[in-house]
């Protein structure tokens, strides 16, 4: 029980911080944190909640299938399946899914992946070589959540990573809450920088492979 309360507090603090950046517009997004490994349980945001508010109903505990462990009227976030795929296939400890203008714009500039390089902040992703290059996969959005989940699952590699969903934000996971938040901040910085650079250089015709 002590671990549950500790993880609840940790996830609540992350929610507060991301809220100050307006990364949960219009109740969008969902975040989770692992509570136990065997059996697998994790806390995840309840569906349809205003994340700018802090309430006792912010999170609920679910199992490896995303089913609530305790009796509750709360429903887990619609994209819980993305979280279950990550936790069931890695040793990740925290998953963050947010919608921002920048990460949605990026998914409209590129088709299957976006390549970013030569930025010091890439070191936040535990990539240390000089002038490093990263590739972030982009998958299509699907209203049918199981289809979205299956396409997402194909890109889960390792205990930390990220996947962009076309016009549906980014999902980032890490070894723990600190690692996941650090990675999310790095990706959002890179997206913002990339978009600003393209605007200075004259738009996508001079810098990006436009996706349409």
Curated annotation (Swiss-Prot):
Belongs to the aldolase class II family. MtnB subfamily. Its EC number is 4.2.1.109. It catalyses: 5-(methylsulfanyl)-D-ribulose 1-phosphate = 5-methylsulfanyl-2,3-dioxopentyl phosphate + H2O. GO terms for cellular component: cytoplasm. PANTHER family: METHYLTHIORIBULOSE-1-PHOSPHATE DEHYDRATASE. GO terms for molecular function: methylthioribulose 1-phosphate dehydratase activity; zinc ion binding. It is an enzyme of class 4 (lyase). Gene3D superfamilies: Class II aldolase/adducin N-terminal domain. Keywords: Amino-acid biosynthesis, Lyase, Metal-binding, Methionine biosynthesis, Zinc. This is Methylthioribulose-1-phosphate dehydratase. It holds the Pfam family Aldolase_II. Zn(2+) binds at residues 97, 99. Pathway: Amino-acid biosynthesis; L-methionine biosynthesis via salvage pathway; L-methionine from S-methyl-5-thio-alpha-D-ribose 1-phosphate: step 2/6. Its cofactor is Zn(2+). It comes from Bacillus cereus (strain ZK / E33L). Binds 1 zinc ion per subunit. One of its GO terms (biological process) is L-methionine salvage from methylthioadenosine. Homotetramer. Catalyzes the dehydration of methylthioribulose-1-phosphate (MTRu-1-P) into 2,3-diketo-5-methylthiopentyl-1-phosphate (DK-MTP-1-P).
């Amino acid at each position: 029980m002590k671990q549950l309360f500790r993880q609840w507090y940790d996830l609540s603090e992350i929610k507060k911080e991301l809220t100050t950046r307006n990364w949960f517009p219009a109740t969008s997004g969902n975040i989770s944190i692992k509570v136990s490994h065997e059996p697998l349980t994790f806390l995840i945001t309840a569906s349809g909640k205003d994340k700018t508010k802090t309430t006792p109903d912010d999170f609920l505990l679910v199992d490896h299938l995303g089913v609530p462990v305790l009796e509750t009227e709360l429903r887990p976030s619609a994209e819980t399946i993305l979280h279950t795929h990550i936790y069931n296939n890695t040793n990740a400890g925290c998953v963050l899914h947010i919608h921002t203008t920048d990460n949605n714009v990026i998914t409209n500039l590129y088709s299957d992946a976006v390549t970013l390089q030569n930025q010091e902040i890439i070191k936040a992703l535990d990539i240390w070589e000089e002038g490093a290059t990263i590739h972030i996969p982009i998958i299509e959005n699907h209203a049918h959540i199981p289809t979205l989940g299956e396409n997402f699952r194909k890109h889960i590699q390792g205990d930390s990573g990220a996947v962009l969903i076309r016009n549906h934000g980014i999902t980032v996971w890490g070894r723990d809450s600190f690692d996941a938040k650090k990675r999310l901040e790095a990706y959002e910085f890179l997206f913002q920088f990339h978009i600003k650079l393209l605007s200075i250089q004259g738009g996508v015709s001079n810098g990006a492979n436009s996706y349409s």
